[in-house]
Amino acid sequence: MKTLFVLISILYAVYCFSSEEDVDSAYLANELEPVEDINSEQYAALEPKEEQERSCADMGQDCKDDCDCCLNIATCNCWFGRYFCSCTFGDYQTCLRKKGKCKRNRPQSCPRSNLNRKKG
């Protein structure tokens, strides 16, 4: 029973690959016409708009300094000094620095971790 199932699976796979090649070769030889979209006029007015540049960069995106990064604790980390800069996670001190120097994307409050506080 297993061998019959394997044999049928192999035959089906060969059939699928051979039929794809027939369609591809027929399309390349212009034997098949490309399908036209009937509703193309309906969507002509809905052309995509140019994406506006964001005021801040998400984690992993390019940045020039800490003020370019969105999150309060995000810092602009650069390789080899000033090359290949991207926003990465910082800490509480990063947030305080950004609060002091940034005019745009200025943090309103800095989150403090509860891990280091002593209880009792």
UniProtKB/Swiss-Prot annotation:
Protein's name in the database: U13-lycotoxin-Ls1a
Q: Which organism is it from?
A: Lycosa singoriensis
Q: Which family does it belong to?
A: Belongs to the neurotoxin 05 (agouti) family.
Principal location? secreted
Prosegment location in residue numbers = 17-54
Q: Which residues form the Agouti domain?
A: 56-95
Q: What's the entry's take on its domains? A: The presence of a 'disulfide through disulfide kOR' structurally defines this protein as a knottin.
- GO CC terms in record: extracellular region
Molecular function GO labels = toxin activity
The UniProt transmembrane annotation reads: none
Give start-end of the signal peptide.
1-16
Q: State the compartments where it is located.
A: Secreted
Q: In what way is this protein post-translationally modified?
A: Contains 6 disulfide bonds.
Q: Name the tissues where it is expressed.
A: Expressed by the venom gland.
Q: Which UniProt keywords apply?
A: Disulfide bond, Knottin, Secreted, Signal, Toxin
All disulfide bonds of the chain are C56-C70, C63-C76, C69-C87, C78-C85
